[in-house]
Amino acid sequence: MTLSRRFLILGTICLLYGTATAQSMLADAPKCAIDCLTELLSQKEYAEMGQEAMCSSEPFAKATGVCLMVKCSMRQTMDFIKESSAACGIPPTNNTTSYRVNSTVVFAFALVFFALRIVTKFRLGLTWGIDDTLTTLSVAVMIPYYIVLQIMLALGLGLDMWFISDSQIILIFKLFIVIEVLYLTALVLVKAAILCFFLRIFPDHKFRIVVKCTMVFNALIWVGFFVFVFFQIQPFSLFWNGWQQKKGHLILTGFTNFTLPLAGINLLLDIWMLILPVTQLWGMGLKLKKKLGVISMFSVGIFLTIVAAIRVRELVAFLLSQDLTGRHFQSIIQITS
């Protein structure tokens, strides 16, 4: 590196970190990051920038990011982001504790309502149906889901990606596959339980055919997910180490092409399942007030529809984010609901 280039970089780091630490920061900064700063600061539009302008300039941030992705490894890039964020006074994301509390509260509520269902079933001597079995299975699946989620939080889920070690990131991505499989399995079981409940209480022949077709469609969603997960990305290890090889775009493209449509289909299926009982309840020989009351009881599932809509929004935000571990929890916390 020429003396003039070294002074140029030293001046930049003085702006970012202060003169007292400039020499040490220069020694610690990756050569690729220094090269990027040199390249950018030689351009007219960035040459006269001060610290505040550098920290607040979106074009400068984007240009730096593009250069780092080309010239640096992912770890070098993340280390530089961590240092520059501290220099610019950008606080690190750390919502792990609040997320752990939120997920625990939601999971506890789910267990309480399930326990109330079981107690009521036995105290009143009600018949145990297939829908009860499927509901029990869904809760059984959600227990390991919750445990895996807590492990992911302990590893750094909810923190900025650049504050987590490579081994932690890899393990989080591996557990991400596990948690998605558990989530979709629980979701399919819950919907199957609701559809079986419809079959138990509504005798109309045509309606029952429609419900059974809906059950088949619900099962196909589950099968389609597994086909995607295990056959879309080859080699399969790209799911957890593709980010190191700068092949993460292949994974995100796959998720964009499949996960978003899947979330949209699930949302439409939720809406369809809200409409199904209404078609039967509306024809009952009840007064309007009682009819609306019964319909409102069956419409409690609108909560799941709202959750599905939030999931679509959060998946879009997750796929567009560069901070995969920091953003990932917003796309996952509502799953526990």
What are these language model-derived features?
Residues 25, 76-77, 206-209:
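Residue-level recognition of alpha-helical structural elements
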Residues 84-97:
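Short, aromatic-rich amphipathic segments at membrane interfaces
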Residues 1-26:
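Fungal secretory targeting signals
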Residues 29, 34-70, 94-155, 170-337:
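Eukaryotic multi-pass alpha-helical transmembrane domains
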Residues 159-172:
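Juxtamembrane helix-capping/reentrant segments at transmembrane boundaries
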Residues 66, 71-85:
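Extended, hydrophilic extramembrane loops/domains of integral membrane proteins
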